[in-house]
Amino acid sequence: MFDEVSVGYDRMNTVSTVGIDALWRIATTRAVDPRPGQLVLDVAAGTGTSSAALARSGARVVAADFSPGMIAVGERRHAGNPNIEFVQADATGLPFDDDSFDAVTISFGLRNIVDPDAALREFFRVTKPGGRLVVCEFSRPPASVIRGAYYAYLEYGMPVFARLASSNPVAYAYLMESIRDWPAQQELAHRISRAGFERVAYRNLTFGIVALHRGFVGESKGDL
């Protein structure tokens, strides 16, 4: 499915969010806090838009995605960036050694993984002691008025944008369903903690349409 929408994926995201996705990306990058020389894993990186934002700090970024189509587009777009390496990978079985990354992040991809809990455990496995995880994902607005308006937009507004801007509106119908079915903020925080991360907290972006979760790996991880 993602292979079929890879070429127009970024355009559709910008159109359907009225450009707010750029602000969410800035917030995510700040939460990851990438630093020169650090190694960051960007899971479900798609065409590498978020990876490029992370790499501007001087960090080295591994952009991992399950879709060969997304990887191909990303490699073409970022061919001149020596700080980004694209890798085709399954988030539930990452091809990396334990304790490989200073930070792991995933934006708008966790809900599309068949077994999100297995993916979270993999994120914990490959993160170094003292490292951090940042998850940016669509969520559930806590205010009923905002939630109702948002769900109405998903039902009636986004399909219009999908038909105008996407080569595969059916794929975006699935994405809308996955957003509605995704757990609320507190439940996701619990699942991240259950995977092994400590000091898990979240903050809402755009009235809770998106939530930014962050957790840390304890320094004693290597003793477990």
Would you name each region that the model predicts?
Residues L39-G93:
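Class I SAM-dependent methyltransferase SAM/SAH-binding core
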Residues D102-P116:
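A short SAM/SAH-binding and catalytic strip from SAM-dependent methyltransferases
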Residues C136-R191, A195, A201:
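C-terminal alpha-helical "lid/dimerization" subdomain adjacent to the S-adenosyl-L-methionine
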Residues A195-L224:
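Core SAM-dependent methyltransferase catalytic element
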Residues D117-R132:
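A short glycine-rich, Lys/Arg-flanked "PGG" loop and its adjoining helix->strand segment in the class I
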Residues T92-A103:
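A short acidic, Gly/Pro-enriched loop at the edge of an enzyme's catalytic core
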